[in-house]
Structure formats: C-alpha cells, structure tokens
Regions:
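Contiguous, glycine/small-aliphatic-enriched amphipathic segments in soluble metabolic enzymes
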Residues: 2-169
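Active-site neighborhood for divalent-cation/phosphate handling
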Residues: 172
C-alpha cells in the first residue's frame, strides 16, 4: 500500500501481482501547475510529464496557462497529450490533463527568449493558480520556471515566485 499525505491520506491498494490499481477519481491529489514563462521550458516539462498515462493515475493535474500556447508547445514537441479545457480548477476531470485558460490574448512564443509579454503571462498564471489554491480548489501548487527579470511588474516586485508566494500566503 502506498500512502501519500497532503491535506488528506490517499491509499492505492495493490493486487496479487503487487502493481498499483487506479485510485478512485475522488481520491486523487489535485495539483495546480502554473505555466511559467511561455518562452521557457515550463510547458515542455508539464506536457512530457503527463504524456505518461501512469501519471494521470496518481494525480489530477490542473495547468493554469494559455490554451493556444500549450497547443503550440504540444505541436512543436510532437506530443499528442490531449488537454481538457476547463473554466475553473473545481471543474477538473480525473484522468485528464486539465487546463484553465488564464488569457485569450495573443502571445508570441520564441523559445529561449523571455520578454515582458512572456513574463506577464507567467505572472497571470501564477496569480490565478495562487488564488485558486487559496480558495481550496486543489491540494498542491507546483510552479514552472519563470524569468525573474521579465515577470516584474507593478503587482510583482519580488526576487522570484517563492518570495511572491511567501508574501501571499505568509505561514499558511
């Protein structure tokens, strides 16, 4: 038996061959994931991780990002990982790679070239993910890499997202 603790205990029973069975959908840990810098490695990490179907048996991922950018990355990486577009984290579907579309703005993707536009997209994703986490929509928040210089704006004056989250949540 494998037990994972985070807000609640989740048990994965094993069969005779000692292989994990799929947990009940309601038992899966919900993981909110900020997209990070749209010109960085965030989507590559996320999409490649969840292209393994076994990962979707362990958790319910919820990306906070940009659907068009995610699809661009999928196509560029040659991945067929389907995305389940949802309006809010509470609508996440177990067994799917869920994405909450944080913006309908057109975003130009240039790999390895962070800019103010990709920094603002990273901030919007992080802000919406943090708000949903604070409201209890999911169990764990994972942040994809950001450009610490390009994410800076009037609302984000921190060294990085760790400091932003510390300021936002304090000792929670």
């Amino acid at each position: 038996m494998l037990n994972i603790t985070r807000k609640r205990m989740i048990s994965y029973d094993t069969d005779i061959q000692n292989t994990p069975e799929k947990a009940h959908n309601s038992d899966l840990i919900k993981i909110g994931i900020s997209q990070g810098d749209t010109n960085g490695v965030g989507y590559e990490l996320i999409l490649k991780t969840f292209s393994d179907p076994g990962m979707l048996e362990l958790c319910t991922p919820i990306i906070f990002g940009h659907v068009k950018v995610a699809n661009f990355h999928r196509k560029t990486l040659g991945l067929n990982t389907p995305l389940q577009v949802i309006a809010r984290a509470e609508d996440a579907v177990a067994g799917k790679l869920n994405i909450v579309n944080c913006s309908d703005d057109e975003i130009n993707v240039e790999f390895g070239k962070p800019c103010a536009e990709s920094g603002m997209a990273a901030f919007t994703s992080l802000e919406k993910a943090a708000e949903s986490y604070k409201n209890g929509a999911f169990d764990v928040l994972v942040t994809a890499p950001i450009s610490k210089s390009d994410i800076q704006n009037d609302e984000f004056r921190f060294v990085g997202h760790t400091e932003y989250l510390q300021d936002r949540f304090g000792n929670e």
